Amino acid sequence: MDKQNLYLGIDIGSTTFKAVLLSGDGTVLRTVYKRTQPVEAGKVACTGHCSACGACSGGSVKRLALEFLKVAGISSFSDISSFVVTGSQIVEDTKKFLPYDFQVSEVTAHVAGAKFLHPDVDAIIDCGGQDSKCMVYNLPMNLWTSMMSGVCAAGTGSFLDSVAQKLGVRIEDVADRVNYDSKTEFSSVCAVLSATSINKFKNRVPLGDLLAGACKAQARTILNSVGQLLLNAPGRKILFQGGVAFNKAVAYFLGKLTGSQIIIPQYHEVMGALGAAVIARQLHDLKASGHLNLEKVVYEPTRGKSVALRIKSTKHDFFSKDETKPLVWRNLFFPTEILNAMDCRVRTLETYAALFGRRADKVKEALGRAAQKGFDGQTCSFLRMLEGMDLDKPDFIVSTVQPCQQAERVFADLAREYKIEDRLYSLQTPINAHSRNAVEVMADGLAESVFEMEKAFGRKMDLGRLEEACVLSNEAAALAKKCQELRFTSPPLVRGSEAIYNAIVFSQLWGRQDLVDIQKAYYEELLMKKEWAEKRYKIGDTHRLLWLHLPPFYDTRHLDFIETTCNAPIVFEETNFVGWEPLDPKDPYRSLAKKLLQSGFLDPALRVEYVKRAVPAGQFNGVILYTHGFGRCSLADRALSKHLREELDAIHVPLLTLEGDCMDASIDPCSTTTKIASFAEALNLNRYGNIFGKLNETK
């Protein structure tokens, strides 16, 4: 082949290998779409030093890539000007076998490929063997928004593969054998249980009807899992790409369901690889121009006094054996000013469970014991941890009805198990902060809880100490607000992947001098870090992300990926936001009731309102919501994410929802990093005009 700039894009999926070779003038020189099989025996990974036999999975990929190039007249990777990879099967070891220049997310690759062929496209559905994706261009935001399916294979190529295999039909022949007028419907679109659905029908309806039911189910499930982005845009042109687009029947039923024009583009089966090749050309041009600036955001490295103070308080609170003080279990929301004023040993159970999050053996053991007691994955993993752990027997238990009623049931179960049902107090809390008489009802409830604890402990509440606790709480809150203001109005000062674990909203130190000392030290540290950061960055030099809800506690991998790999700082975290008015020490119960109502976590509407106010105040250009429990947690459920997305759309700020579990690493979706990467790439494209990052200023 004549010497010219050549750009290679490779997409390694769960069931296929795709590659595209692009010339310098944008001509598609060669493509390949090849189904792959798992390695039957032997190694699946090695050092990559030989990589000639192709016996391992990495070697096999390299062999396929070199064969692809050889047919095009290219002898080695060194003849390629720029090489970009994408796909769900790109892993850390892939670099040993494929000398690529950049890894792009599947979402961005599919958008780039689609726009290369159809520059006016603004809606895309991609359906592959492992996941399905929907990408829609949001004109007011000037960026692509996307959704990806989670851990379930329904709605992906795996489902139709299993159906075709069960019916003895080649997957390539399915569309031609479908009865497009059939009324047959499948109730199940589970790729694993598809045999059950088929067996229910196969001896009663013709083959064409069965295939029609499967294809309709496929189309419906694609829309159910990722098609929400298309709900407000009927009649638009949608590109349907990926391996499933070979099946024109699925495209037909997608058109029926959406009322839109479904277009299967040329090269639909290799669109991710085509997009990777297009991006390889963009990367080559930017590097050649010398404008690309890939420097990472850095932070003032001093580990401050506040960290040591937090560690000291945590160890004292959660591992103290001082039996002269009554032990009280609480949930995340019952006011600790009351418990600290009564000189209790406080144990916030959800926080206690989280402390063991990085001990995989402890988590596995606790979840296993909880399962034996009947608590499966439908129950919050924090609560399953509590059901499976050995806990010190408390003298009293306090909790709140909102925001987690599931926790109420588990707390009641634990009280029964520990034989202290008569020492459990559940504070009635409304879901709406503006409910009539909400403050009075809660204030009466707090007073009643104190009365019950006084009976249990055999001593009275010292109202002077409660007044003092309110004063200390106000001091800590005022300092927290100053810290908040500093972080809102400065370049990134600390890594969000570290600050998120402060979670002061849920702290059990409210009402104690400890929290005042911690927040004072933290504020002084932030002042120093602000001076350091402002010598290096302006506030608009970086992305500014707001993190909502809790993080995974088993490791910081996803947070590190956001901040380090994607170079997108998490500037602030919802769990460190203080938005309530100062307490009135002379009216403690009413004040604490107001504090609880104004925290935002009891009232979803108020919580969304806080986020809307925070976005302009902190100049955030992206928001991330971690939906613990895959949206089953009431603090991050589908209703909240829907409301949040609608409100953020109205102010043109993108929301990324990450499904996962804060405690159970075994069910972490493999698509999480893809979602994060595509979000960061979209932000880069919006802010810098390219997906890679900041450009050097030109004089």
Description of each model-found segment:
Residues 87-91, 230-257, 268-272:
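Glycine-rich phosphate-binding loops at beta-strand->alpha-helix junctions
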Residues 332-333, 338-363, 546-612:
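Redox- and metal-dependent alpha/beta enzyme cores, enriched for Fe-S-associated oxidoreductases
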